[in-house]
A protein has these predicted regions:
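Catalytic alpha-helical scaffold of carbohydrate-active enzymes acting on polysaccharides/glycoconjugates
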Residues: 76-80, 100-102, 120
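Short, amphipathic alpha-helical "lid/cap" segments that border enzyme active or binding sites
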Residues: 72, 76, 299, 303, ...
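Nucleotide-sugar donor-binding catalytic core of glycosyltransferases
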Residues: 1-57, 64-70, 74, 81-83, ...
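Membrane-proximal helix-turn-helix segments that form the acceptor-binding/catalytic region
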Residues: 117-132
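N-terminal Rossmann-like NAD(P) cofactor-binding module of classical short-chain dehydrogenase/reductase
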Residues: 88
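A charged, aromatic-enriched C-terminal amphipathic alpha-helix characteristic of glycosyltransferases
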Residues: 311-342
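Active-site proximal beta-strand in glycosyltransferases
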Residues: 102-117
Length: 346
């Protein structure tokens, strides 16, 4: 079986999901072509030409609409050189419906992996008609999707054992508390209300919305306009004594889009896989799978929880080990194995 994997446009966060699926499929012996849609979109969006006969007057070669068209044409080019059985589109927000419709019309089975449920389910719902199979990262709107499409499934977030595993950590990254994630406004407001005084804290991720005078600014471990890749993030997890999972509150306003998800997010699974202790922003699935980990509901609850657990090493290490055992089977390989089985049944 041959898969063409179309990476998402953004080069952070959901890119880790794409690489996880790619590697999981390859572990099964599947022939996977990794289509770097992100690089191509960046290239066409960034290309400039000199219109001044060497005088240095540079203009953009393409506006964004044209850049998207050219990047989408490159998907077609790769597809018809490789001719896959399955096209796995991760996220797909920058892939045009025409591109998917063309591949379906020529007999390729198009799988759309939706990574933004339920926050952007309005957009994902409108897009799913162009796929043969739709995979959701949260089941809260599963029945709504199934009312519109005959082959929709919830596939849980997963981790890559080569990246997310227990370990001693790195001395330079040792901390009392670490959090890696996008600095959405809701998260900024939450963390600014947490008492971190006296704790060694590391924050990572894209925090471009953070004000210069925020008390969180000195805690960012890199430039605020940078991201932290998954390998570095896992090392931060292994090096810290505690962490926290906090879901964003931002969501689109269309049909089905909201922030009240059911499923565990990717960071919860990755933290548990690294055997890192963390406190939870509760959700039904994590309440079921990770009930051994404590929960919080407001910023004022965070510091007392951290103080108690940081003072009790044995108890903290015990629940972290139990959390790892609870997610040990949630690998990309297992998700990939399910998908191959689903596509080849009958």
């Amino acid at each position: 079986m041959k898969f063409l994997l179309v990476r998402p446009g953004p080069t952070f966060s959901v890119q880790d999901v794409a690489f996880g699926w790619r590697d999981g499929l390859r572990e099964l012996g599947v022939n996977v072509a990794d289509m770097n849609f992100d690089d191509r979109l960046d290239f066409y969006s960034s290309a400039h030409i000199d219109r001044s006969a060497g005088e240095g007057e540079w203009i953009k070669a393409f506006d964004f609409a044209d850049a998207m068209s050219l990047a989408n044409k490159s998907i077609e080019s790769v597809c018809y050189e490789f001719w896959p059985d399955v096209v796995l589109v991760v996220s797909g927000h920058f892939v045009r419906p025409h591109t998917l419709a063309l591949m379906r019309a020529r007999g390729h089975h198009v799988v759309l992996l939706c990574t933004e449920s339920p926050y952007e389910d309005d957009r994902q719902l409108a897009f799913c008609e162009y796929a043969d199979t739709v995979l959701l990262n949260d089941p809260v709107n599963l029945e709504m999707f199934r009312a519109r499409h005959p082959d929709v499934h919830y596939v849980p977030h997963a981790y890559n054992p080569a990246i997310h595993h227990p370990g001693a950590g790195t001395p330079e990254l040792k901390s009392d508390f670490a959090f890696v994630g996008t600095g959405f406004r809701s998260r900024i407001e939450f963390f600014e209300a947490v008492d971190f005084d006296g704790l060694d804290v590391i924050l990572g991720g894209a925090w471009v919305a953070l004000d210069d005078d925020s008390p969180l600014a000195p805690l960012i471990a890199h430039r605020r306009d940078w991201c932290m890749d998954n390998t570095d993030t896992a090392e931060v997890y292994r090096s810290t004594r505690s962490s926290l999972n906090l879901y964003r509150r931002e969501a689109r306003e269309g049909e089905g889009a909201h922030a009240d998800g059911v499923a565990m997010g990717p960071r919860e699974v990755e933290l548990a896989a690294c055997e890192t202790f963390f406190i939870r922003d509760p959700r039904p699935e994590s309440d079921d799978v990770l009930s051994m980990l404590p929960t919080f509901s407001e910023p004022a609850e965070v510091r007392p929880l951290l103080d108690w657990w940081l003072a009790h090493d044995r108890e903290r290490e015990d629940v972290a080990a139990r959390a790892r055992a609870a997610v040990v089977d949630r690998t990309f390989r297992n998700n990939a194995e399910w998908l191959v089985r689903h596509l080849t049944k009958g």
